[in-house]
Swiss-Prot record:
Transmembrane segments: none annotated. This is Large ribosomal subunit protein uL22. It comes from Pediococcus pentosaceus (strain ATCC 25745 / CCUG 21536 / LMG 10740 / 183-1w). NCBIfam families: rplV_bact. The gene is rplV. This protein binds specifically to 23S rRNA; its binding is stimulated by other ribosomal proteins, e.g. L4, L17, and L20. It is important during the early stages of 50S assembly. It makes multiple contacts with different domains of the 23S rRNA in the assembled 50S subunit and ribosome.
Amino acid sequence: MAEQVTSAQATAKTVRIAARKIRLVVDLIRGKSVAEAFAILKFTPRSASPVVEKVLKSAVANAENNFDLDREDLVISKVFVNEGPTLKRFRPRAKGSASPINKRTSHITVVVSEKQEG
């Protein structure tokens, strides 16, 4: 007998925002219901908010379309941010020298699952 799937996930790879900046936003929505998370993200004034909202929307769509889960019963069970590849650039400085510039990227993963009864 096949086991009932109760979670779905979505990932955004190589997002051009540093992981530590995205983690500030992600920490606000961990463990919340999907509706509450969308409300929090809508009013969070950070550049990472729309990106995290897009990944969350994708995870909810995956849950509804692929696994027939109800949107009202979904909570964010896991959400994490990993560092992606770093783009290394150089900025010219005085006296012919140069300083390194690291343009950091991130991978965002959101896992939504059905609320546990009880």
